[in-house]
Regions:
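Acidic, Ser/Thr- and proline-rich intrinsically disordered linker/docking segments
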Residues: 2-14, 19-64
């Protein structure tokens, strides 16, 4: 399993399992631009840019 590590809006490092990501979009959370990562049953916001998240997911898909 290849995890991608990103920072959530609290500044904590979180592990994202790309295999279960269903949707990614930009949003505003507490006045800050964030990237929302959606999974089957939940979602969370990370501070990395949309482009960074998409590139990481695409890089993972090319390796698998």
């Amino acid at each position: 399993m290849n995890l991608i590590f990103m920072h959530d809006v609290e500044g904590e490092l979180v592990a994202v399992n790309p295999e279960y990501v269903t949707f990614v979009e930009t949003d505003i959370y507490e006045g800050k631009h964030v990237t929302m990562i959606y999974f089957t049953n939940y979602k969370f916001a990370v501070t990395e840019s949309f482009e960074t998240v998409v590139n990481a997911l695409n890089g993972w898909r090319k390796r698998t």
